Each structure stands twice: as structure tokens, then as C-alpha cells.
């Protein structure tokens, strides 16, 4: 009976130790993957396409405005057969940015009143 109990405790200890090492390996792999994704995103952010420039080569490369990312919009010019794609800001997002800017300015004025 003592042998079975000792064997059970020993196997449980070894199992928990191996599980902990496996979890550490998984955590390290997740951390490395996250760092590589962040580096790729930073590199991609440096190569963004400015507003009203051609984005037909990569439709997800448009730059961000203050709050929102611009959208690659494609259209056919009048009398033309070739599709033209440019980075543009949708009107509803433009209005939302203007409203947020005005709210920020108004909030600054209120803070000055109470200072």
C-alpha cells in the first residue's frame, strides 16, 4: 500500500512539473508571436498610402486619420474603362471626427472655466 501511495505521489509530481514546463513553452511561443505581429504592424504602418493616392496595389494599406483608418475606394472614371482606387475617408467618419474635435475643444474651454 505504501508503495502504491509513494508511486502515485511521485507520478503526480512529475506530471505537474512537465505540465508546468509545457505551459511555460506555450507562453513563450505566444509572447514571441505577439512581438513579431507588433513589429510587422509597425513596419506596415510606416508604409501606408496617404489620402487620395493610388491604393490599387494593396487595398488595406491606407493610412489612419486622427481617429479612423481611411478606406480604399475604387471607381471607374467617366469615359474610362480602367478602375481607379484611392484612399479616402468616408463622409460619416469625417463628420464623426469633426464632432469629436469640437467636443474636445469645448471640453478644454469648460476645463478653463473651472480652473
UniProtKB/Swiss-Prot annotation:
Predominant location: secreted
Propeptide feature ranges: 21-44
Gene Ontology molecular function: any one: toxin activity
A single cellular component GO annotation: extracellular region
Entries under Pfam families matching the protein: Toxin_35
Disulphide bridges: 48-63, 55-72, 62-87, 74-85
Subcellular location: Secreted
Tissue expression profile of the protein: Expressed by the venom gland.
Keywords noted in UniProt: Disulfide bond, Knottin, Secreted, Signal, Toxin
PROSITE patterns, alphabetized: SPIDER_CSTX
Signal peptide (UniProt feature, chain positions): 1-20
InterPro entries, per the entry: Spider_toxin_CSTX_knottin, Spider_toxin_CSTX_Knottin_CS
Family, per entry: Belongs to the neurotoxin 19 (CSTX) family. 01 subfamily.
Domain-level remarks: The presence of a 'disulfide through disulfide knot' structurally defines this protein as a knottin.
Protein name: U3-lycotoxin-Ls1e
